[in-house]
Every structure is written in structure tokens, then in C-alpha cells.
Amino acid sequence: DGSASNDAGNLIAEARQAMLLQRVVNGADAMSVREALELATRGGANVLGRSDCGRISIGSRADIAIWDVSGVESAGSWDKSALLLSGPTTVRDLFVEGRQVVREGQITTFNLGEAIALQSTLARQLCDGN
């Protein structure tokens, strides 16, 4: 799914939604968190005919996200995979094809403040018809 048919491009949120919809229609045990994650990763890659991604293995393309789950909101969570669908939304560290692009919650590849200012200017111009 993407911005053409949805209001966000968040793979984790889509996996969670798929799991919840299965549970509403087919019962609480209809889809586990692990099944939802596999559907979102391996399943998505398989649908696209991409054997080079969708899994963490030698030779596969990979983007790796790391969340800090040491906070009180994650305390007592017994299923660590469930944290992916219900845990923190802000990534601590992010690697895209081996290159770190977020470190300790901060984007490392561009100046976020400048990007926000530019976006605000462009949005204002668009709304003003300039």
C-alpha cells in the first residue's frame, strides 16, 4: 500500500492493521504477530518477485531499524516480536543497505531543520497559489 491509496507509508502500521483485521473477522488467534511480520517482509518480497530482500540473510538487501524498548511503555512485554507492532514509533537507529541514516534518534544524512523549513515554505506557496 502507499500514498496513492493510503494516508501513510508505514509498513509496521500496515502489518498491525492486517493482523487486527484478521482477528476481527476470524477470531483472536487468526494471525500472530510473527505471521503479520512475515507477511509484511517475506510475503511482500515474494509478491514482488524479489528474492534479494524480505529477509535478513547473507547476500540479501536489508534495512534494519532498532527501537529503544527500555522505557516504561515496554516494561513487562513478554513477546519481543509484539513490540514491533505495539512499541515505540520513533526509531533509535536505522541502517539502509548498510549505511546508518539515523543515530540515537537523529537523522545523519541531511539537516532536518532545513528540510522542515523548506517544506513549510513550499506548502505555504502551494496553498497561496504561487
Residue ranges and their predicted role:
Residues 1-70, 85-87:
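His/Asp/Glu-enriched, well-ordered alpha-helical/loop segment
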Residues 3-5, 27-31, 94-100, 123-127:
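Short C-terminal domain-edge/linker segments immediately following a structured domain
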Residues 8, 33, 37, 108, ...:
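Generic structural signal for well-ordered, non-membrane alpha-helical segments
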Residues 15, 27-30, 77, 82, ...:
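Hydrophobic alpha-helical segments
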Residues 61-112, 116:
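C-terminal cap of metal-dependent C-N hydrolases
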Residues 116-130:
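Short, solvent-exposed cationic patches
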